[in-house]
């Protein structure tokens, strides 16, 4: 489980996160949504140990600030919003970083084919010897997902709870590969892993999320099922635009359509 209690993040004079409390459970997909600047990525950076914060954050019962980075790396893998790398890595070298973090070696029989298998899962089977920095943004995001899958090799999930932390994993992808990524996340959760994802596509979020957390101006505005969170009034209040929310036929899943492209006048 991921548990955050009274999390605050300050950047200069501006408070980015304001007393955030939230929980995300293993075996489920928890999706954080909210407008740009609401604190979504800041929360992920705090959870990843990239930025300081006040309050308490635990992952599988381990305090994020008190646990060695090497230990945390065995329990969670992060797909960051930016997938740019400064060095001229080959694609297979980027993917193999996931194995090195967990102190696995490519020479071990059970792991030697894992990087290639994960590239196949994300639709990049023939990309292993291409230069990473020459790929498109969407291709780089899929390579990073392959790295994440290597780092939290799924069959281990039932012995050591593992987490995927995904910061806008589908932002640069076409619809085909958006579904590939989200189905990988769903399968990972079904196998006992935990998924915490930031998404901007509210309709895909509604389809895949077991729990949704809506942020507004650094605070948790509401949380719960998609039907609870994605109401016309909630979205109007948080996003300041007119949206119509209905339900998909034969499914208890909200579906969102714009009523107008113009922002509400205040």
From Swiss-Prot:
Cellular component GO terms, alphabetical: plasma membrane
One term of GO molecular function: ATP binding
Main location: membrane
Pfam family, one: ABC_tran
Annotated binding of ATP, by residue: 34-41
Protein origin, superkingdom: Bacteria
Subcellular location(s) per record: Cell inner membrane
EC code(s) of this entry: 7.6.2.-
Membrane-topology descriptor: Peripheral membrane protein
Keywords: ATP-binding, Cell inner membrane, Cell membrane, Membrane, Nucleotide-binding, Translocase, Transport
Domain ABC transporter: 2-242
Record-annotated membrane-spanning stretches: none
The family this protein is said to belong to: Belongs to the ABC transporter superfamily. Heme (hemin) importer (TC 3.A.1.14.5) family.
Task performed by this protein: Part of the ABC transporter complex HmuTUV involved in hemin import. Responsible for energy coupling to the transport system.
Subunit structure, interactors included: The complex is composed of two ATP-binding proteins (HmuV), two transmembrane proteins (HmuU) and a solute-binding protein (HmuT).
Full protein name: Hemin import ATP-binding protein HmuV
Organism: Bartonella henselae (strain ATCC 49882 / DSM 28221 / CCUG 30454 / Houston 1)
Taxonomy of the source species: Bacteria, Pseudomonadati, Pseudomonadota, Alphaproteobacteria, Hyphomicrobiales
């Amino acid at each position: 489980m991921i548990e955050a209690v009274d999390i605050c993040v300050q950047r200069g004079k501006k408070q980015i996160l304001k007393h955030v409390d939230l929980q995300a459970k293993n075996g489920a997909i928890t999706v954080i949504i909210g407008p740009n600047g609401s604190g979504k990525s800041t929360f992920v950076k705090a959870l990843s140990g990239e930025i300081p914060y006040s309050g308490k954050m635990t992952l599988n019962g381990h305090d994020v600030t008190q646990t060695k980075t090497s230990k945390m790396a065995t329990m969670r893998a992060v797909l960051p919003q930016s997938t740019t790398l400064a060095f001229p890595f080959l694609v297979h070298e980027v993917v193999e970083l996931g194995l090195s973090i967990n102190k696995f070696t490519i020479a071990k029989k059970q792991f030697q084919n894992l990087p290639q298998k994960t590239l196949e899962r994300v639709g990049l089977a023939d990309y292993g010897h291409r230069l990473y920095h020459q790929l498109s943004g969407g291709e780089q995001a899929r390579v990073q997902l392959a790295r994440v899958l290597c780092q939290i090799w799924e069959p281990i999930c039932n012995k050591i709870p593992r987490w995927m932390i995904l910061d806008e994993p589908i932002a640069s992808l076409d619809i085909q590969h958006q579904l590939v990524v989200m189905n990988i996340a769903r399968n990972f959760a079904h196998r006992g892993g935990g998924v915490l994802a930031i998404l901007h596509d509210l309709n895909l979020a509604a389809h895949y999320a077991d729990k949704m957390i809506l942020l507004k101006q650094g605070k948790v505005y509401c949380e719960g099922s998609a039907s609870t969170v994605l109401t016309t009034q909630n979205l109007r209040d948080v996003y300041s635009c007119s949206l119509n929310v209905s339900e998909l036929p034969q499914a208890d899943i909200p579906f969102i359509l714009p009523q107008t492209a113009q922002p509400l006048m205040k």
